[in-house]
Amino acid sequence: NQKNHAADVSPTASQMPKLVGLAQASRIYRNLSTKNSSKFSNNGNEIAWGTIGNASTSEGVFFEAINAAGVLQIPMVISVWDDDYGISVHNKDQTTKESISKSLKGFQKTDNQPGLEIIEVKGWDYTALIDAYSYASKLARNDHIPVMVHVTELTQPLGHSSSGSHERYKTTERLEWEKKHDCNLKMKEWILSNGIANHDDLELIEKNAKILVKNERMSAWNEYQKPILKQREIFYNFYNDFIDKTNNDINLQLIKKELVSNTEPCYNDIISSARKSQYILSKFPNINSKKFKKWLNNLKSEIEEKVSSNLYSYNLDFYNKIEITPLEYDENPKIVDGRIIIRDNFEALLSKHDNLLIFGEDVGKIGDVNQGLEGLQEKFGKIRITDTGIREATIVGQGIGLALRGFRPIAEIQYLDYILYCIQILSDDLASLNYRTNAQQIAPLIIRTRGHRLEGIWHSGSPMAGMIHLLRGIHIIVPRNMTQAAGFYNFLMTIQQPAIVIEPLNGYRLKEKLPNNLGDYTIKPGEIEILKKGEDITIISYGSTLRLVQEASKKLLNNGISVEVIDIQTLIPFDTNKNIFKSINKTNNLLIVDEDVPGGASAYILQQLLEKQNIFKHLDSKPVLLSAKSHRPAYGSDGDYFSKPSFDDIYDAVYNIMHDQNPNKFPRV
């Protein structure tokens, strides 16, 4: 009977995808026993309750979620609060037939076909609401039938927000109707008509409730203000000491005057006043402001920690303490397609973790489009290896909800291009979940996808900068081959951190050595790998392009140029031990090769190196960024050659850097 709350999200309809996963967990728990099932479910009897406004049902993810719920037959009850408007826009301009329940009739279950149950009820009719929700609850809990309760004739007493009255867009007749059908008024009428209480009793309850709320509000605000006012007093004490020593400096007086006038200060008001004061104090060398600076820095750090902590589940210290399990090979290892390594590694993980679920488009019956899950549905069953429809936002939503309820889901987004369909849910919900709940809720969802270079305009892009900037809070992992990808999956299964693993799309048929400890060896996010040591220049890259970098580095050696090749491996986190700095400190030259657009991931990489690793003063030449073109890759081999960094582009870029430093040894070509 425990009630749980999943952190909400404000963007309209964004709660819907996760709701699918929360409800699906109950269905799975009813049919699949795992080691820790009892911690998360009572035989799948839990209902996932959700709410949405009538106007938000026009969002695509609402329809996607409704369709998914009907297909999956999950215990989800969604309430649609309908007041006829979406801010100022009437239902006739929002919804077909001016009614979401009428619009969705095709989804409604029949005697012969499963679907949703759709119930329509008036929001001011108390007894009808009880009947409606009792029926909805019974259907969902007992039979795992999704239900939509369309609650109509609701009112909007104050309009959508404080930015403007609803009198601007509602007719006089509508406003009058709302006064008569206000839910509180109708509830009062029902209580009086049934003799439950008299008018005086209700008036007293209403009066006392208002007093209680006002008192509690003031009490909460005073408690919140206490530590802030204490810090302001500390600032005043410093000020009183400084004002005499600065001959009553007028600028210092103005700073205090402004702060005193603020009757309800925030921390930023105090800290801002203190920071401004530092510049005034710097003009008086006789003043010892060490204690003041220490107090200011401590307070600033304390508040920054409160505001900025828990974006990720773990900090750097935690990762540094984790021991990795190294790769192991037989003396004469088999040479196999990369897909075999990823497939057999998933098989090992599924055997090891009974709460691991893998789902997505085409992952079940055919074992994914590149055969990385071949035969695993047959071995582990349809509950654990599941095909889904083409609906990326709710695939991610399933993963978030399932992860919140104790499963370890790997949700497959078939191609990196398709991340755009679910980027909003990934950004607004998954990436920010740990942060916005202050680590009280976490969804360790792993997104499996594939991408990078391929010939053609689709399935060949590498929009890494978009992901890096929109998905802070999620690890972005970019392995160069399937052996590395498997090691990252193994590591991620040992921690509680959401991540996206982008397998190289053109690598499934390339040959790799078969490890003998699949499912066990681990590769830690944030650690680079030096693929080739060198002395003259450092080239850093990731993913598919590394093969071209390695090929070019061999040819460059024939021309007397020694290249150090580094695989970044993960963009977030990025080189946590600052090992790239050590390489640049040795070679003093840098080339970043990236198949994202100009100013994309390469700019992020350079920012990390300049600001966090301080490489600038160790460079003998300007860092060079070699990226793809701004457009999508064109079709055919020529399209690939002229759209993405090629072997020749890499060779030329390195040669030109060396020419600038030693034109006699490396004459211009």
Regions found by a protein language model. Give the residues of each.
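Thiamine diphosphate
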Residues: 1-49, 80-498, 502, 505-669, ...
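Phosphate/pyrophosphate-binding betaalpha-module
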Residues: 11-13, 17-19, 24-135, 440, ...
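Short beta-strand segments
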Residues: 13, 51-52, 78-82, 150-155, ...
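Short glycine/serine/threonine-rich phosphate/pyrophosphate-binding segments
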Residues: 15, 19, 57-65, 87, ...
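Secondary-structure transition/capping motifs at alpha-helix termini
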Residues: 29-32, 42-43, 69-77, 107-114, ...
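Alpha-helical segments flanking ligand/cofactor-binding loops in enzyme cores
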Residues: 67, 397-400, 490, 554, ...
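Short hydrophobic alpha-helical runs that function as membrane-insertion/retention elements
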Residues: 75-80, 118-119, 385-387, 409-412, ...
